[in-house]
A protein has these predicted regions:
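N-terminal Rossmann-fold cofactor-binding loop
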Residues: 190-193, 211-212, 235, 259, ...
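Glycine-rich beta-strand-centered segment in the early N-terminal region that forms part
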Residues: 9-25, 34-84, 106-107, 127-133
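Mid-domain Rossmann-like dinucleotide-binding core that forms the NAD(H)/NADP(H) cofactor-binding site
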Residues: 130-214, 218
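Glycine-centered, small-residue-biased loops immediately flanking beta-strands
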Residues: 253
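Rossmann-fold NAD(P)-binding glycine/threonine-rich loop
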Residues: 259-275
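C-terminal hydrophobic helical "lid"/dimerization subdomain
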Residues: 243-247, 286-335
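NAD(P)H dinucleotide-binding glycine-rich loop of Rossmann-like/cofactor-binding domains
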Residues: 79-166
Length: 335
């Protein structure tokens, strides 16, 4: 990872906006190319962002220069059939334009400025300019909180339900917040990291399971009267994590999987036998942003606590190293 000067992003389409970032961050998924597991060639990194709009195209109607905005890592028009169905992360217009994700046709957002395609369908204006304390919380909403919330929603978190979370990274911790806010009665965090266990408890976890594999599954079954969790969040993306999620869920239960898959497969025979409901993929964060922003401004959630290392963007390589070595849960980059 290197930090270098690049040309200032410009409007490419009449539906674009250019923003000046207030902060960015490093995502767990950024570690896959960092570790060589995903081929890249001088790719400008970053897909999480908040900041001030400085320029908009002629067809942008919902945001204007001077507005502070939060956006999703997936681009969405807000109008196509897929967006209307509640899955803006798979926007038909954005994919057709080559702009399905931040950074595909323009710079990534680990940068001072960024072009945001389909601004009307991607960006959400905040009710007021944020305080310094609110910046990390809004930054988390851009991806990890929204992704975790989606996973908890897909796992059908709700009153009287038990939700297990596999993965104690920022997304898994965001899922704990989501499960709590959606009303889950029992939230089981599967984690061996004492610092992350404590944060999970602050966010609403009622139980912590340190065991993994079959031992971890047995512990979750013990906590659920031998039946299993109503829903499980899988927030890692490995075979071991998915197998653990499948073992922890009850018959007829739900798995919300948002860990980016790497060399993993789904045992359809087990899915069939347990009658498991399965939903996952790139999170439709844009759908949840108005709710998340409202909760943050009301002070009801503090997702920015996942950031345990703050660095200026010039020191981004140190942040990658810290997350790779798991000495940091999530790194906030300041401009």
């Amino acid at each position: 990872v290197v930090v270098e000067d690049r040309p200032m992003p410009t409007l490419l389409e009449s539906t674009d906006a250019v923003i000046k970032l207030a902060a960015s961050c490093i995502c767990g998924s950024d570690l896959w190319p960092y570790r060589g597991a995903q081929p890249v060639d001088h790719q400008q990194m970053g897909h999480e962002y908040i900041g001030e709009v400085i320029e908009v195209g002629d067809d942008v109607k919902t945001v204007k220069p001077g507005d502070f905005v939060v956006g999703s890592f997936c681009i969405s028009c807000g109008e196509c059939a897929t967006c209307q169905d509640g899955y803006p992360s798979r926007c038909l217009k954005a994919i057709a334009a080559g702009d399905g994700f931040i950074g595909m046709r323009s710079n990534g957002t680990q940068a001072e400025y960024a072009r945001i395609p389909f601004a009307d369908g991607t960006l959400v204006k905040t009710p007021a300019y944020p305080t310094a304390e609110q910046i990390p919380h809004l930054m988390a909403a851009s991806d990890v909180l929204g992704t975790g919330w989606y996973a908890a929603d897909a796992a059908k978190a709700g009153p009287g339900k038990t939700i297990a979370v596999v993965g104690d990274g920022a997304v898994g911790l965001g899922a704990v917040i989501g499960a709590k806010q959606l009303g889950a009665e029992k939230i089981i965090m599967m984690s061996r990291n004492p610092k992350r266990q404590e944060l999970a408890k602050q966010f609403g976890a009622t139980h912590v399971v340190e065991e993994r594999g079959e031992e971890g599954i047995a512990k979750v079954l013990e906590l659920t009267d031998g039946v299993g969790a109503h829903g499980v969040v899988e927030a890692v993306g490995t075979q071991q994590a998915f197998d653990q999620a499948l073992g922890c869920v009850r018959h007829g239960g739900y798995i919300g999987f948002v860990g980016v898959p790497h060399d993993s497969s789904i045992g359809t025979d087990v899915l069939f036998g347990k009658q498991v409901h399965l939903e996952g993929g790139p999170a439709p964060v844009r759908k949840y942003l108005p709710t998340l922003i409202d909760l943050i401004y009301k002070g009801e959630i503090e997702p920015g606590k996942v950031f345990d290392l703050v660095l200026p963007i010039d020191e981004a390589p140190k942040g990658y190293e810290a997350m790779d070595q798991r000495t940091a849960t999530k790194v906030l980059l300041t401009m």
